Amino acid sequence: MFQRWSFALCRPIVAAAQVSQQQVPPSEEPRNESGAANPPLVKEEFLRQFRERLANDKTGRNSLEGFLDLPENLPPTAASIGPLKRGKEPLPPWLKLKVPMGASRQPRFNKIRRNMREKRLATVCEEAKCPNIGECWGGGDEEGDGTATATIMVMGAHCTRGCRFCSVMTSRTPPPLDPEEPRKTADAVADMGVEYIVMTMVDRDDLADGGAAHVVRCVTAVKERNPGLLLEALVGDFHGDLKLVEMVAGSPLNVYAHNIECVERITPNVRDRRASYRQSLKVLEHVNNFTKGAMLTKSSIMLGLGEKEEEVRQTLRDLRTAGVSAVTLGQYLQPSRTRLKVSRYAHPKEFEMWEKEALDMGFLYCASGPMVRSSYRAGEYYIKNILKQRETVEAPSVSDGGNEPKDSE
């Protein structure tokens, strides 16, 4: 916009300057005492007329507001640098994060990152450029009361499915599994020094068991090397084969997680055709039945994909009916141009509402917020929930003990 009106403004001035240049032959140009030519009169005339025209401009475009093509109701001080892409809205304030703290203030974060580089271990935290990496890896370094958490992705970096929200690379024939991966993962986790690890996986529909046996070997190796570690396995649906689900659920993990991702209506447009809403519910329900409620089950929902309020509420009900104990809700953000676009940015107040409703439905805990992801600060929430459960169990015994008669001396 600035170019259009500025060119229109300057065109008559340039024309006048060209006329002035023609009226002053080169031989008659004013010269100083040394014989050198003075600055061209054309430049002086141009600047004089340009300043005069700007000073007399009454269009209102000769201002900061006129110079910047701002979105409606956006003050100039909040303008983005550079042009906005057509159809792309600026991020709301609650999705703009602060730069993570430096090395001197986050020793846990830097230790984990250093070990990742040395072991050449892939994490979803870095691969997906998760905005919460400082909080999870730092684990409350500043306050000293948090739990460092990391998310490791096993079975390679290529997935056989093509969900439209995910940025993980897709391949029909991914590389074969690394038989040394269980040992390497266990060694790396031991060096990382975390208290809680989330082990996720790519879908491997090219394998007969979907990689279930490999996941069990990884879980077992990590727990044997790190017996005090809390381990959450965020796994796929294994083609809906419940025997494979039982195989993983029977391994020494602490939390069985499987994400339902979104509400039922939009699932065919969001997830790969081999995944389904009802199949995910069936997997989660079977884990709860197989372990007789002893296994903590967990799932996650994304907002901003075109869902309606009542649909989110129904999804929470379905998860709770399936016996899911923990749920997370977060804002979907488009990872690349080829992925689904964001339909809306849910306000933080809405996430607070869903957290309250989830807890009222009977979930043991709920992490709900714009930047929350399925493994967001998983260790901290898990530990707090365990402590809360212990306090609830111990409270009656203390009360009962207080009512017991004392032995006579």
Swiss-Prot record:
Region (Disordered): 21-41
Reaction it catalyzes: [[Fe-S] cluster scaffold protein carrying a second [4Fe-4S](2+) cluster] + N(6)-octanoyl-L-lysyl-[protein] + 2 oxidized [2Fe-2S]-[ferredoxin] + 2 S-adenosyl-L-methionine + 4 H(+) = [[Fe-S] cluster scaffold protein] + N(6)-[(R)-dihydrolipoyl]-L-lysyl-[protein] + 4 Fe(3+) + 2 hydrogen sulfide + 2 5'-deoxyadenosine + 2 L-methionine + 2 reduced [2Fe-2S]-[ferredoxin]
Organism: Trypanosoma brucei brucei (strain 927/4 GUTat10.1)
GO biological process terms on file: lipoate biosynthetic process
Cystine pairs: none
Binding note for cofactor: Binds 2 [4Fe-4S] clusters per subunit. One cluster is coordinated with 3 cysteines and an exchangeable S-adenosyl-L-methionine.
Family: Belongs to the radical SAM superfamily. Lipoyl synthase family.
Cross-referenced NCBIfam families: lipA (TIGR00510), PRK05481.1 (NF004019), PRK12928.1 (NF009544)
Note, other: This protein may be expected to contain an N-terminal transit peptide but none has been predicted.
Names of required cofactors: [4Fe-4S] cluster
Binding, [4Fe-4S] cluster 2: C159, C163, C166
Name used for this protein in its record: Lipoyl synthase, mitochondrial
Lineage: superkingdom: Eukaryota
PANTHER family registered for this protein in UniProt: LIPOYL SYNTHASE, LIPOYL SYNTHASE, MITOCHONDRIAL
UniProt domain Radical SAM core: residue ranges: 142-364
Pathway linked to the protein: Protein modification; protein lipoylation via endogenous pathway; protein N(6)-(lipoyl)lysine from octanoyl-[acyl-carrier-protein]: step 2/2
EC number(s) on file: 2.8.1.8
Gene Ontology CC entries for this record: kinetoplast; mitochondrion
Binding site for [4Fe-4S] cluster 1: C125, C130, C136, S375
The keyword Iron belongs to this UniProt entry's keyword annotation: yes
Localization per record: Mitochondrion
Sample GO molecular function, one term: iron ion binding
InterPro entries given in the database record: Aldolase_TIM, Elp3/MiaA/NifB-like_rSAM, LIAS_N, Lipoyl_synth, rSAM
